[in-house]
């Protein structure tokens, strides 16, 4: 591989490798050169024919190594079947290193090339599945500066987290993005982005990924990878397939700039449709209808208590009782259910400082509440945040007093 950490290393590496590439090209094979790693793709109608081609090309590689005074890594040199159903029970391929000296190349079912994990049959499932572990480890390292109660503000933490992990996840998406048409691929990316969003949102672990995505305003990462893959194909003039959001006819009749805008519009349309039909995050959906809202709003930085109301998940008794964490779902005011809507709109404990009109909450004819007006302006949103924080402070104060009285009388 290319020496790491030096300025001139890659240039010198390219110069030294050029001789081997010229010899390989002269032997009648197509050469596609990438810095750092070397891969030889051999094809044939039988396994014996494939091994013969590999043998010829590896002999060139070994001779080049002897000439340059370097050795080929036996540990990293492996072979794998990318297509076809040749017998691989032997799990090794013999190639001639020198005259009458043979080396066995280990057969593997998965290898990492240029940062992408490739499996037999040209599959990328392992690459996508591995993202969850990779992202989780990275998030743990960043938690010291991304605390919930102190540290970077929302905008900065979002920028750091998204800027750190999205490029890692979407790297080389144009090669493997078709894996995302399968549920396991989408679930793997969803699990990865969940770690990142949880690190910069004041939410309970029980909040759905769909709701977190809307609260951050981040395009779901499977759609982000689809978008980047489509933009890459548009810029390179590559043929589109049924999974892509633009068609070949549109590519032929539109400019690159218009196509990039079209790709962006359509992936957001897909996200909006998902949010409308989803069964998850329905409390959040009563406040935020447009998935682009959080991404556009500079003032939307909900704290812990506000997020509890926007998601319906938190320390309220109705939520805790449903999960067996509270003996009763009742409110201290005497109501049978202390849920988010009760606290925000009906609880008599907070009646003295509640003003639904100022918060943008509308009472419908049937007695139900409409909350889309809450986020229609900074004024209504600010009034709601002010009310929620004041209500939670009073609630905690009353709970402490009641607990103290129980301790005294107990």
UniProtKB/Swiss-Prot annotation:
<dbReference type="GO" id="GO:0004519">
    <property type="term" value="F:endonuclease activity"/>
</dbReference>
<dbReference type="GO" id="GO:0003964">
    <property type="term" value="F:RNA-directed DNA polymerase activity"/>
</dbReference>
<protein>
    <recommendedName>
        <fullName>Retrovirus-related Pol polyprotein from type-1 retrotransposable element R1 2</fullName>
        <ecNumber>2.7.7.49</ecNumber>
    </recommendedName>
</protein>
<feature type="domain" description="Reverse transcriptase">
    <location>
        <begin position="1"/>
        <end position="118"/>
    </location>
</feature>
<dbReference type="Pfam" id="PF00078">
    <property type="entry name" value="RVT_1"/>
</dbReference>
<dbReference type="InterPro" id="IPR043502">
    <property type="entry name" value="DNA/RNA_pol_sf"/>
</dbReference>
<keyword id="KW-0695">RNA-directed DNA polymerase</keyword>
<keyword id="KW-0378">Hydrolase</keyword>
<keyword id="KW-0540">Nuclease</keyword>
<dbReference type="InterPro" id="IPR000477">
    <property type="entry name" value="RT_dom"/>
</dbReference>
<feature type="region of interest" description="Nucleic acid-binding endonuclease">
    <location>
        <begin position="254"/>
        <end position="410"/>
    </location>
</feature>
<keyword id="KW-0548">Nucleotidyltransferase</keyword>
<keyword id="KW-0814">Transposable element</keyword>
<keyword id="KW-0255">Endonuclease</keyword>
<keyword id="KW-0808">Transferase</keyword>
